[in-house]
Amino acid sequence: MSADSHAASSVEIESKYDVDDTTPLPDWSALPGVVSVGAAEPRDLDARYVDTPAADLARAGIAVRRRTGGPDAGWHVKGPLDGAGRTETHWPLDDDTSTAPGADLVVPPAVQDAVAAHAAPPFIPLARLRNDRTAYALLDADGEQVAEFVDDHVRARDERRGAESAWREWEVELGPAGPADEQGRAAFFAAVDAAVFAAGGRPAASGSKLARALGH
């Protein structure tokens, strides 16, 4: 990441679900505002998370990762849940080379500054999550994205304990054309729940992939 890279922030509003390997994809036809589903988009994601030796970031409800693959490759800082969602700040990778073979994961100064109120170096490896993701855009009548549905096959390693795990999960995240008011969002995600449960999915047992990788 170059010194002049600019961060971009957004609020993620999403629901997560646990599913079995054989669970079929949901039928989204009853979702409010959704008239079509975009083509499957495969993504090969590799995320490496860090924290301090004293787990200062975890105590603050913050996750810091460097992820490659997908449209938002880069460094990400996810804040704690606040109301309906979590604020995520993203920096592009640019000339960052900290995932070259054998390289140490070095947290860039801009990312360190973003979490300075909660944590200070040194940062150490916390977990690595590799994700074979298939993404689908849920589109309205104008072709705008109401939400994104992702089907994730995750392989995780807890770097502290050397423990490995694997699972499948789904996420549905509101997009730019999604409902903006609380009532509309509630109705939308109620319909998402109904579609997921009808397909055989269930509410996620963990609040995040990182939490599940760490056994929480």
Q: What kind of feature is each model-predicted range?
A:
Residues 1-216:
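Phosphate-end processing signature that detects enzymes handling 5′-triphosphorylated RNA
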